[in-house]
Structure formats: C-alpha cells, structure tokens
Amino acid sequence: MILGLGLDVVEVARIQRILAGPPARAERFLARVFAPSERAYCDARQDRATRYAARFAAKEAAVKALGTPEGVRWLDLVVERGSGAPSLALDGLAADAARRLGVARVHLTLTHDAGVAVAAVILEGTGP
C-alpha cells in the first residue's frame, strides 16, 4: 500500500548561485543539508550543482511524502548511491516518522534536464 508520495523540482541555477557565492555561505549550506557521502559524490562530478539539486529535491520530496513532520533535519535524509539506482536512507526524526506511518520501503527516483532537477519519493508499507 502507498503510504506517502512526495515530488519536488529544484532549479539547478539556484544551487549554482549558492555554490558560486561566498565560500563561507556555500559551506554552511552544504554542511547543513548534505551528508559527507553525498558531498563526496557530488563534488566528484563536473555537474556538481545538478547533482546537489537532485539530492535537495529528493530531501524535499521525502519530507512531503512523510507528511512534513516537525524537527526533521536535512541530514536525517541521505541519498545513497550504490551500484544501481539511488536510494534514500532515513535517520533520526525522519526514521521515527516512517516507523509511525508503517513504512517498509522507500522508493526514490531522480532526474535532471533543461536546468531543473526532479525527485519523487514513494513510501510503501502496511500502515500503522
């Protein structure tokens, strides 16, 4: 059963402006929003702003799918990249919210084209 659905679109230029802006501001944003593994992945790519935008969209989509629970931090939501499709790891209050909803699986898809990054998150489970 589908327990939650979230969709988000991020303009890549918005993230590019942050990355190209004052270094201290960019670092604060990256440290507050992205886990070290996400940063390592994005920073190793030529299109890093696009990669960051897709991950930011994934986090926004996940929060929407969870019902916008209070207190969830960006770092409670981590996009992981194994050998296949990206996945979303939940920690902290995000994991607590998922448990309360009865979430068994989190599905994530990312795409980017024409200056935007899009993410969709589907929460699947049996319910509370």
Swiss-Prot record:
EC primary class: transferase
GO MF annotation list: holo-[acyl-carrier-protein] synthase activity; magnesium ion binding
Cofactor list: Mg(2+)
Metal-binding as UniProt keyword: yes
Reactions that this protein is recorded to catalyse: apo-[ACP] + CoA = holo-[ACP] + adenosine 3',5'-bisphosphate + H(+)
EC number(s) per entry: 2.7.8.7
Cellular compartments annotated: Cytoplasm
Chain residues that bind Mg(2+): 8, 60
Annotated transmembrane regions: none
Any Pfam family the entry gives: ACPS
Signal sequence residues: none
An annotated GO BP: fatty acid biosynthetic process
Function recorded in the entry: Transfers the 4'-phosphopantetheine moiety from coenzyme A to a Ser of acyl-carrier-protein.
Protein name: Holo-[acyl-carrier-protein] synthase
